[in-house]
Amino acid sequence: CQDPRGGGHFSGRLTLPIVAAGVVAKKMLADATMLDDAPVTAVQARIVELGGIASCCHSEGGEGVSDGQILQCIQNDNGSEANNENWQAVIDQAIKEGDSLGAIIECTVPDIDPGYGEPFWDSVESLVAHAVFAIPGVRGIEFGDGFQAARMKGSEHNDPIGEDGRPVKNGAGGANGGITNGAPLTFRVAFKPTSSIRKAQQTFN
């Protein structure tokens, strides 16, 4: 039964156990190894867009960019670096207006062996999406080139294969035909703005 005063199973109360489970999983991965006995690099995640403003801090797998740098390093829609605006200012403005912001988080699994997943119903993408959508506020997910692939030609989207047998560009995001291909598994998750805000809105009592 949904409590009319707010909260319920979509509030932060039940997001916390998911976070706790993720912490345990990351600790378990720290002791794991790949097929060639190489250590598994921790799953990485970073904010790539906040309030419609994209980050211009790009490093492979999210390494080498601190949270402070990300907050100060953004770009406008035209791709030019903004000098007088940053994510903190956007956050402060939203708070001042009693509003909230959406965001896009990019997640990368740098070290994952090929062969995980299944074609069709149990593809690695569908299993990841199934888990991700358990997080309240998630409204979308894309892998690799994602929706941008719809604007590409086949020659642009196809992944060239390097001498090591792995994709060079990784436009597929680490999976082909529902099965991991040995490249980093990369996906982005869209979060809606929090619906609980101070700003007056039309409603029905």
Segment roles from a protein language model:
Residues 98-205:
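Glycine-rich anion/phosphate-binding loop at the beta-strand->alpha-helix junction
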Residues 1, 60-61, 72, 147, ...:
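Exposed boundary/loop context
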Residues 2-58, 65-120:
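Glycine-rich, mobile lid/loop segments that gate access to catalytic sites or pores
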